[in-house]
């Protein structure tokens, strides 16, 4: 298919000023760019007068590695202009095989257990290498491109080190370390683009730091990028630790989902500013360090998942798991005992306090801003606990506990009730989003699975709106359009080592987006999280139109991009 885009205001992804131009696309590539192209015939011509042509957006932190198999249409990415996902973040990668991926992911992410096991249990999809995973994805014909990483959790688990509790923490045995290094090398040989880790999740939190650094030296050997989910999600201590480890290993560093929620109390330093200062110092000292930022920062907690998953219960209430209870029903029955219920309340308080110290969120004061959705009582729908407390004369904290235990007739909920903590709305954190996102070393990211999470689980607002919101936050606060587009295109492509996409240039792959620069922005919010972005007209992937004048075309021309190799052929 050939395509001619005429009369466009071209923003090329480099940060350079826009220019007027026509762009001719053929055989997946940008063949020609000129002020006017009138001497070629194309299968399709798009008049982009009044619109802006940009490279396709690159999401440097996606969690689409599992959901893409079942939802290859990837609507949430396409409708906000994303044409390439980097996947396998936070150490959970589909490499080296499906069984290891499932084992490590579901052991930690309790809320993912049911979805992944239900979908994969009876599916025909299986793989035993990165190459085979790529073939599985291509057999599903993805709408956009994906770029896989190697993950620490998957590597150490496959190597035989399977820590599940603090008592399992130890140095890896020489044979385990040798196997882990071989797995990393093999992943890179098969085309993985980098290495991801985390320090907050099982089993990664029990790995000895020196062992992580030893594995990072292999990443440096192959000149790949390290993508850490740092300790306590980018607290100053976590950022400092990541920088120190990167220096010791000599590896290029990209810090994942930089935390914009400060942990501060009156008279103390905003920890977001402190963490940014640590990054600046490292950069001044010559270190290659970058980071990404979620443009929405809210958390969604289905209470039925919180209370109905005993593994998650044991994690949330580590000091007082459900004593003697073998089922959720037994636990709920036991919770009717006031003494036991108060024990659980006190444990929750301790958990919230620890989380506030570590991460800077889950303050008790946030409870009055918690929003309820999918309730069985329409009088509760969309209201906050603060509003309900005011209406009914209760306390937001007690109402939250009543909701979890489902004992209050006021807050009697359906099994699918959702609790949202809107952590960048209504609190003085919005400025931190701007501060971090406008930083010269930052790029926006989504940090969620693609379209297809369970209906009963509310979408994180980033799922459909991270990039349009990031654009609006920047442009509406005086950042030049060209710089905002660069952060979503050419810059993340450079960070990950992608050389044939991210820019509107002759010879580059034709991943392109056409937007209305005034209207482009999020259509969603914390409650209506799945509303599509405004002001996006066309999305083109590998030269084919996947969104045509605002409508999805059902084209799925995406590819699995493997470093140093040609694209994986379609099945």
Predicted regions and their residues:
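Active-site neighborhoods of metal-dependent hydrolases
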Residues: 133-137, 142-162, 167-176, 180-202, ...
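C-terminal cap of metal-dependent C-N hydrolases
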Residues: 351-354, 434-441, 447-449, 459-461, ...
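Divalent metal-coordination and catalytic microenvironments
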Residues: 8, 23, 28, 50, ...
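Glycine-rich, proline-tolerant flexible connector loops at the mouths of alpha/beta enzymes
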Residues: 94-95, 197-207
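Alpha-helical scaffold segments that flank or form the walls of functional sites
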Residues: 66-149, 172-190, 213-221
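Acidic, glycine-enriched loop/beta-strand segments at the rims
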Residues: 10-22, 415-427, 433, 480-485, ...
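Histidine-rich, glycine-flanked metal-binding segment
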Residues: 1-3, 10-56
